[in-house]
């Protein structure tokens, strides 16, 4: 009996270590979310697409889709109901979409706009040698303050050798605009470990939200993370988390990395592998953040299907296309392999 009690104590200590970088108030939030996850299990199935439902495996792919407007066409002067009708006509129907999973054409069950609120984590490299000052870093969460839509919430986390919560999930502009004093540049960056903590302890409990987003602010450098890059990327893809990056100049100048991609390549794979995009810190950050928020609210669709004729032990490339040339599509590049 004593030995069993000791093992339980050790497990509790392990859990404490995992969340040590997150303050008590967030631990409470995570615990409550985990309890609620039982009631949200059906939503979890749709988001992860990894559990059979009624004998079939429901899978969801997040897609950014929009029509390219002809610049030569006159601007619409409609208002009220007429404007609403015009907006409805711009919605892209599933009939003009084709979808291939691992080279096998799939029957699309639904392709519909996702106007639900977003949960966005701004993950900022707070390490000593990053080629950017804290004032510029603080400008990123501040840029979200006027741009997030109703229901959206943003969390700010800084990382060096460990992640630390700067601002918990909030839609309060004052909190998002006052992170400068909480930033400090120290130590070395463990980006992959920080992303893993965000995935496991922050976004996984938020599985009821279909829009779970990470905005990485940094150059993509990782030093000595415990989790391997491929394992991390597979987790993000399985959970349908979208990664954006606001890229800082590479402090390594493209130097080769042992057992990890180069910094710029890491950001490229993280964004392309999850359907996100890369922006440059040298560009107007306010414009970049506005584009992120606008496309999350206005251009995000969910494609739902039951995979047929696929092999889950293989990496499966995804191909989504449209019969209409004016429609642009962006989505994660592939489903990761899974052992049987």
Where are these regions (language model features)?
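Intrinsically disordered, low-complexity proline-rich regions
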Residues: 4-16, 22-42, 83-84
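Scaffold/interface architecture of coatomer-like assemblies
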Residues: 46-340
């Amino acid at each position: 009996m004593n030995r069993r009690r000791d093992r339980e104590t050790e497990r509790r200590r392990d859990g404490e270590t995992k969340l040590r970088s997150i303050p008590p108030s967030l631990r409470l939030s995570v615990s409550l979310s985990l309890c609620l996850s039982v009631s949200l299990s059906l939503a979890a199935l749709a988001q992860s697409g990894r559990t059979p439902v009624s004998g079939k495996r429901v899978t969801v792919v997040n897609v950014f889709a929009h029509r390219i407007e002809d610049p030569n066409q006159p601007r619409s002067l409609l208002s009220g109901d007429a404007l609403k009708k015009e907006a409805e006509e711009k919605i892209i129907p599933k009939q003009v979409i084709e979808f291939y999973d691992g080279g096998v054409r799939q029957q699309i069950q639904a392709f519909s706009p996702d106007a639900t609120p977003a949960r966005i984590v701004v993950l900022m490299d707070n390490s000593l040698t990053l080629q950017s000052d804290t004032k510029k870093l603080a400008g990123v969460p501040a840029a979200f303050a006027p741009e997030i839509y109703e229901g959206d919430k943003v969390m700010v986390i800084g990382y060096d050798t460990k992640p630390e919560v700067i601002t918990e999930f909030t839609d309060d502009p004052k909190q998002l605009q006052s992170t400068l004093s909480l930033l400090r540049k120290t130590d070395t960056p463990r980006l992959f470990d920080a992303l893993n903590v965000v995935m496991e302890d922050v976004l996984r409990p938020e599985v009821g939200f279909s829009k779970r987003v990470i905005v990485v602010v940094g150059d993509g450098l990782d030093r000595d993370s415990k989790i391997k890059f491929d394992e991390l990327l597979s987790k993000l893809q399985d959970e349908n988390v979208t990664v954006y990056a606001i890229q800082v100049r590479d402090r390594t100048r493209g130097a080769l990395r042992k057992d990890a991609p180069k910094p710029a390549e890491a950001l490229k794979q993280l964004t392309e592998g999850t359907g996100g995009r890369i922006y440059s810190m040298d560009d107007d950050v306010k414009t970049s953040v506005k584009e992120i928020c606008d496309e999350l609210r206005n251009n995000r669709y969910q494609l739902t299907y039951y995979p047929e004729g696929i092999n889950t032990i293989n990496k499966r490339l995804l191909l989504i296309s449209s019969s209409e040339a004016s429609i642009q599509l962006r989505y994660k590049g592939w489903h990761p392999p899974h052992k049987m």
